[in-house]
């Protein structure tokens, strides 16, 4: 590893947190490059669980530099709460760095998110209502407020006053809703500014210098390929770019500085919220995966929709992110199933297609074409090598490799760090 990007290959919730945590031990720097506190992951260390939303997983290692890049949108209240919770658990945050170019989430973003979802009725997108989308909207509209603005009281006052007036007018005229008090918000965010100020720096300079000096850098993505604003199942997507290409913009480095890309593949497929899901299961197998895999959102607590592994999706993810190898997670969840399936193509308009369609209307009409595999009953959570796995589990993994054209580098067989089979060193 010199620079390694970790991306989700499905609709998020692939287990990136555990893989990042595992690889972070060998990295010098861990960077978050997109999204906000709409994503979450749970990392275990020495039997203790840590729930993270904004701060990179590397924070659990005091010697690692952890960077929140310019592509992340930061809710200061959420960030400060996360910092304080880690400190209460005895975790140092001294090596946390926050980009001065990152955009700030405000209460009016959260309210706008909620009101827009309500106004869409049955056509709502199922957002986390954390204000992420509206914050990125303001960024695109060039009225966003950045961390560097927050640290200059007069500049911040001018920009916030303009935005509060604009948003209050929007809430009243479009939604018939109450607005916000400028002074109250201004004072509250000045308090936040003082608390985050020690962590703020130009992370583009810092990161460039770290890479040039030979440091090992791990880029930690949130969400997954199919939630990408351009390449995901639009409009049921997030407002940022959780693919490898998002790193260059969201962390402020050039594409030639990326050496490898690891795709995280859950051994089955899950999705939160609305939108087509070709391999979704509505039977006892779907319930089995949900309960055994504890498929409930870290951020929202929402039950995840569950289905069989979809190789069409995985091939698409490999292609658009240039993935070089993959980590397979939650293989142990499949233990106990008599039969396991992998979708190898879609039946659409009387023919078989193997490329992921752009149109959601087309995707909704796609019927999965499956290959069926025998399952296994053996407990695999103690497996230390590939050969320790049951033959049927090995066969399942090898078929995934054949279907998507890249090799597995890591296999996760349980939630603990030591329940990890490493096939390739980094």
Swiss-Prot record:
Record-level GO BP terms: 'de novo' AMP biosynthetic process; IMP metabolic process
The pathway entry for this protein reads as: Purine metabolism; AMP biosynthesis via de novo pathway; AMP from IMP: step 1/2
Where is GTP annotated to bind? Answer: 12-18, 40-42, 304, 330-332, 412-414
Entry cofactor note text? Binds 1 Mg(2+) ion per subunit.
What is catalyzed by this enzyme?
Answer: IMP + L-aspartate + GTP = N(6)-(1,2-dicarboxyethyl)-AMP + GDP + phosphate + 2 H(+)
Signal peptide interval: none
Q: Binding residues for substrate, per the UniProt record?
A: 298-304
Say which domain of life the source belongs to.
Answer: Bacteria
- Keywords of the record: Cytoplasm, GTP-binding, Ligase, Magnesium, Metal-binding, Nucleotide-binding, Purine biosynthesis
Its needed co-factors are: Mg(2+)
Question: What EC class does the entry list?
Answer: ligase
Record PROSITE patterns: ADENYLOSUCCIN_SYN_1 (PS01266), ADENYLOSUCCIN_SYN_2 (PS00513)
| Molecular-function GO term, any one | magnesium ion binding
- What is its biological role? Plays an important role in the de novo pathway of purine nucleotide biosynthesis. Catalyzes the first committed step in the biosynthesis of AMP from IMP.
What the record says about family reads: Belongs to the adenylosuccinate synthetase family.
Q: How does it assemble?
A: Homodimer.
Listed name of the protein = Adenylosuccinate synthetase
**Species this protein is from:** Thermoanaerobacter pseudethanolicus (strain ATCC 33223 / 39E)
